[in-house]
Amino acid sequence: MVKWCDFTISPFHYFTISLTLYICLMIRKTHLITGGCGFVGRNMVKRLQATTDAQIIFIDDLSVGTHPDTWLKAAKTSEGEGFVIYDNRLLFIQADVLHVMLGFASDSDYFFSRYNLDVARINDVFHFAAIVGGRSKIDGDPMAVALDLAIDAHMFYWACRYLPDRMMYPSSSAAYPVDLQTVDGAIALKESDINFKKMGEPDMTYGWSKLTGEYLAKIAASHYGLKVTCIRPFSGYGEDQDLSYPVPAIAARAAKREDPFEVWGSGNQGRDFVHIDDVIDCILLAMDHIHDGTAINIGMGRLTSFNEIIQVFCKIAGYEPTIKPLLDKPVGVHSRYCDMSFVEQRLGWKAKISIEEGMRRVYEAAVAKSV
């Protein structure tokens, strides 16, 4: 017989109780999402809400992100100083993620100490918190973007000591050498085009910070045993993306039938546009198969110019405006798109949503918002 707590139970019952507890713990996981109110973060929150019964903790200081009251379809069940709980399993903490990570590093029971919330263990970590804001931010305030270095360093410092089950680190297509993305030298970028032993120059401080994050991920995996996946998403877009990004901004202007239609630069510069639903699909699949810090591309593998995007939206809107180039505006590299062969071979994954279908969804959302 086995003595457990104040009860004497048989080995069979002990096994049954232990198995039940184990199954409950395995089923009821807790996931952490930093930057959980930003574009990608909130889409991950909504996906996990819809497809799992896990407890979800998402952190955002709302400097750029949108409060979950405006986009989360869930009942508010509790709230306190600095946090809100929805449906008894989605916990939103309004805070600077740097402060939270510093608190975690010094106190393993930080959530209880700070918020009086009992969080036994964090299983998956989705680290989306970053200083972002599109091309104008990357070129216009590069030192602010460099703060991403501090955010990522503190996150990996905590993760290497806490060791969650899995972690996802979002790098960026901006980490690729800019000399591979010129007018004459543009190529479909392969994962192997980034080589830490033979470095090219990434895109501004944002690219450098993401490249450094990838390096930290490799160190975390090899030296500390952290199971980490890195992604290099290209130009993600979606219906609820902020208007500071080109796709929703172009859609909104097409919905208003702007004519002449202004475009930054010549409009011939191109990107690899991929819908947010496809991005989330690929992230979740990659986390099941990649744990050593290897970085993968997420894109369509197709170069589409901004002039072509304007044409798609205006065709949907049913008019043909005159295009007006704004040559004094920042445009970044000329051409950035990816080679998806590694992902197709390693994960068997391809994006499902075509440019035409994705842009139609964005346009319809823009029309709905303008009503």
Predicted regions and their residues:
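Intrinsically disordered, low-complexity proline-rich regions
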Residues: 4-18
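N-terminal Rossmann-like NAD(P)+-binding domain of SDR-like oxidoreductases, especially those catalyzing
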Residues: 16, 21-236, 365
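C-terminal substrate-binding subdomain of Rossmann-fold SDR/epimerase-dehydratase oxidoreductases
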Residues: 30, 44, 76-91, 95-96, ...
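A short beta-to-alpha transition loop/helix N-cap that caps and shapes the active-site region
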Residues: 65-67, 177-179, 239-241, 306, ...
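Structural element of the ATP-grasp superfamily
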Residues: 155, 217, 250, 343-344
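NAD(P)-dependent short-chain dehydrogenase/reductase
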Residues: 179-190, 211, 215-287, 301-303, ...
